[in-house]
């Protein structure tokens, strides 16, 4: 049953029999902006949501792993690519879908990439080749815009922001 438990201020799912509280918390999405020379790795999604659109390799964290372990795992799963993490790069709060998106800068250990089970295509792109109109998620688009601005400026500061729900037309 959905109710406010004693000592809490928000409605929670509470078992009427044992009174156990089932907390529903935001999901963590982790991924990499993975670079080889002047190109970055993008994956064309083979699953919903946003089937057929491009994104960086990223996905939900698994229990028992760190954020950077999850980002490395997702890059391997989605693009059969091995990376070395450079630094934490961006964190985006996406409250309307209860997600927190964490991206790392990473170096590809070699340029050999190929699609994983959930990916239609994995490819390295120069900035001018990126299919900007076919990027799957606002968080990824924001991170890539910052990334290329930062590259031109010669420094990669940490970025943080909130992705608001798109307005209905």
Regions found by a protein language model. Give the residues of each.
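Acidic, metal-coordinating catalytic segment for phosphate/diphosphate chemistry
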Residues: 1-32
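Short connector loops at helix/strand junctions that flank enzyme active sites
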Residues: 10, 25-29, 35-37, 49-51, ...
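Conserved hydrophobic/aromatic beta-strand scaffold that supports enzyme active sites
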Residues: 12-14, 33, 42, 103-105, ...
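Active-site donor-binding loop signature of nucleotide-sugar glycosyltransferases
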Residues: 17, 45, 58, 106, ...
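Conserved Nudix-box catalytic region and its N-terminal flanking loop in Nudix hydrolases
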Residues: 35-77
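Unchanged
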Residues: 61-146, 150, 154-156, 167-169
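Short, highly charged C-terminal tails/helix-capping segments
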Residues: 160-166
């Amino acid at each position: 049953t959905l109710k406010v438990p004693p000592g809490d201020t928000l409605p929670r799912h509470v078992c009427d029999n044992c009174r156990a509280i089932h907390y529903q918390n935001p999901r963590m999405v982790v991924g990499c902006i993975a670079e080889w020379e002047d190109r970055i790795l993008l994956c064309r999604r083979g699953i919903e949501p946003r089937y057929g659109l491009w994104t960086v390799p990223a996905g939900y964290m698994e229990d028992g792993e760190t954020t950077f372990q999850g980002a490395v795992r997702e890059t391997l799963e989605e693009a059969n690519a091995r990376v070395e993490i450079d630094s934490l790069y961006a964190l985006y709060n996406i409250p309307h879908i209860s997600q927190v998106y964490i991206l790392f800068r990473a170096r590809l250990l070699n340029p050999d990439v190929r699609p994983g089970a959930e990916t239609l295509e994995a490819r390295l792109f120069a900035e001018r080749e990126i299919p900007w109109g076919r990027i799957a998620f606002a968080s990824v688009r924001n991170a890539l815009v910052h990334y290329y601005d930062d590259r031109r400026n010669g420094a990669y500061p940490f970025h943080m922001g909130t992705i608001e729900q798109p307005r209905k037309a």
